[in-house]
């Protein structure tokens, strides 16, 4: 590694808080868009028999139920992962024991 790349690598540790916040917000937006895409694809395949000019009541009810179950399942998984993370010791703490 030459001196210019080592100095730029050292500068990476001091990230601008505004830039970091912007990246976090954009990452959340990307995750949300991916979730919407997955949900749309899944529910479309499940609920749409024959696309027509108007959504019939059966398809509408199916879409509503599908979206609600998708959200419930996603929330359950996130909560479960959060519980799992809380119950595991932090890596650095486990090394000091």
Curated annotation (Swiss-Prot):
Cellular localisation: Mitochondrion inner membrane
Keywords noted in UniProt: Chaperone, Deafness, Disease variant, Disulfide bond, Dystonia, Membrane, Metal-binding, Mitochondrion, Mitochondrion inner membrane, Phosphoprotein, Protein transport, Translocation, Transport, Zinc
Signal sequence, renumbered to the chain: none
Summary of the tissues where the protein is detected: Highly expressed in fetal and adult brain, followed by fetal lung, liver and kidney. Also expressed in heart, placenta, lung, liver, kidney, pancreas, skeletal muscle and heart.
GO annotation terms (biological process): nervous system development; protein insertion into mitochondrial inner membrane
Motif segment (Twin CX3C motif): 43-66
rRNA-binding keyword on record: no
Entry superkingdom: Eukaryota
Gene Ontology molecular-function annotations: identical protein binding; metal ion binding
Assembly with partners or alone: Heterohexamer; composed of 3 copies of TIMM8A and 3 copies of TIMM13, named soluble 70 kDa complex. Associates with the TIM22 complex, whose core is composed of TIMM22.
Free-text note on domains in this protein's UniProt record: The twin CX3C motif contains 4 conserved Cys residues that form 2 disulfide bonds in the mitochondrial intermembrane space. However, during the transit of TIMM8A from cytoplasm into mitochondrion, the Cys residues probably coordinate zinc, thereby preventing folding and allowing its transfer across mitochondrial outer membrane.
Disease link: Mohr-Tranebjaerg syndrome: An X-linked recessive disorder characterized by postlingual sensorineural deafness with onset in early childhood, dystonia, spasticity, dysphagia, mental deterioration, paranoia and cortical blindness.
Record function comment: Mitochondrial intermembrane chaperone that participates in the import and insertion of some multi-pass transmembrane proteins into the mitochondrial inner membrane. Also required for the transfer of beta-barrel precursors from the TOM complex to the sorting and assembly machinery (SAM complex) of the outer membrane. Acts as a chaperone-like protein that protects the hydrophobic precursors from aggregation and guide them through the mitochondrial intermembrane space.
Protein name: Mitochondrial import inner membrane translocase subunit Tim8 A
Gene from which this protein is expressed: TIMM8A
């Amino acid at each position: 590694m030459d001196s210019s790349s080592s100095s730029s690598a050292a500068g990476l540790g001091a990230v601008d808080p505004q830039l970091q916040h912007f990246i976090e917000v954009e990452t959340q937006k990307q995750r949300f868009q991916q979730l919407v895409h997955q949900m749309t694809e899944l529910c479309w395949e499940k609920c749409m028999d024959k696309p027509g000019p108007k959504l019939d009541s059966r398809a509408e009810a199916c879409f509503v139920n599908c979206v609600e179950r998708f959200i419930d399942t996603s929330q359950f998984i996130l909560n479960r992962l959060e519980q799992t993370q809380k119950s595991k010791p932090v890596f650095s703490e486990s090394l000091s024991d």
